[in-house]
């Protein structure tokens, strides 16, 4: 046996393996890092506002549809708008991953109650809402509250495991989005307002990597001021859903502080003629923001 020849053969083989291993290490070292969340980091979300300018009544209904197929619904409007809400959800795939009810007033939760009671081909995975104290609400209820709607809502939620009650200080992540909650029902709410249902509206921020939107339900002016004093810059967002359909006086400082590029106002034609709403629309524009409402040619934005 030629030992020298055999040695050279093994040496050549070893050198080849070493070179290959070195190339592999260099490739791993020089290749761009891929974050663990790469699967959701590239997802974009289209937020769309719905509403009939000639309906003669206010309502609130939004969808947030992800490029990954996930769907989030916010409120939905009146019970007699059920067919439209149902058709909209069906057009987006019929599967609702999160249905968020800002507060159980008829112009926000009516359609949801009907669909949840009889879903048909619509699948609802989770429901998020504020847990309002029944006795406190009953004590301070107003005629516009339509209290039986709240009772219907609570009866439905008492019989399901899909409900997840949320309030101030809660947060979670969903498919790359971050949800932060700043308001909900609180036992100290009547120190700020005795309008229990509106005052308990979920105020939450939905954030992507670069843009965000703040939803405020129907909070009143005093609640908005308290939130700014408590959460400060955490509330600042790219987009805003105007509180209480753009209504109520004393909102200027709130709109100025949030500093949204685009503000959605859920107000049909008749409501936009109300002095407080008209003034708020003027103020938003004077502050440099755009207003999207039921007559706008564009009624959607992208969170990414």
Regions found by a protein language model. Give the residues of each.
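Binuclear metal-ion centers of metallo-dependent hydrolases, dominated by the metallo-beta-lactamase
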Residues: 126, 134-198, 262, 267-304
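Core dinuclear metal-dependent hydrolase active-site scaffold
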Residues: 36-94, 162-236, 301-304
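N-terminal secretory signal peptides that target proteins for export/translocation
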Residues: 1-11
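Active-site metal-binding motif and surrounding structural segment of the metallo-beta-lactamase
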Residues: 67-70, 79-133, 230-247, 259-263
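Stable alpha-helical elements in mature extracytoplasmic
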Residues: 81-88, 108-112, 146-153, 215, ...
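Active-site-proximal beta-strand/loop segments in catalytic clefts of secreted hydrolases
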Residues: 50-52, 74-77, 101-105, 130-132, ...
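Active-site environment of divalent metal-dependent phosphoester hydrolases
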Residues: 57-58, 79-81, 104-110, 134-137, ...
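Bacterial N-terminal signal peptides
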Residues: 17-32
